């Protein structure tokens, strides 16, 4: 497993590092809490 960073879609802040299987072709999207936005927002995997 490889850890990938997640960026907030609203502010672009890099908040989380989550494990992901290396063979997966799709990008990860999760709804997580962003402390900078002070709300739950969509976070997408970044390179």
Curated annotation (Swiss-Prot):
Annotated GO CC locations: cytoplasm; ribonucleoprotein complex; ribosome
| Keyword Ribonucleoprotein attributed | yes
**Which Pfam families does this one have?**
Ribosomal_L33 (PF00471)
Q: Name one GO biological process term.
A: translation
Q: Which UniProt keywords apply?
A: Ribonucleoprotein, Ribosomal protein
Xref: NCBIfam families: PRK00504.1, rpmG_bact
Designated name of the protein: Large ribosomal subunit protein bL33
Name of the gene: rpmG
């Amino acid at each position: 497993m490889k850890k990938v960073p997640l960026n907030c879609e609203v502010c672009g802040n890099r908040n989380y590092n989550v494990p992901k299987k290396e063979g997966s072709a799709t990008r990860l999207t999760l709804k997580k809490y962003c402390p900078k936005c002070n709300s739950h927002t969509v976070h997408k995997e970044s390179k």
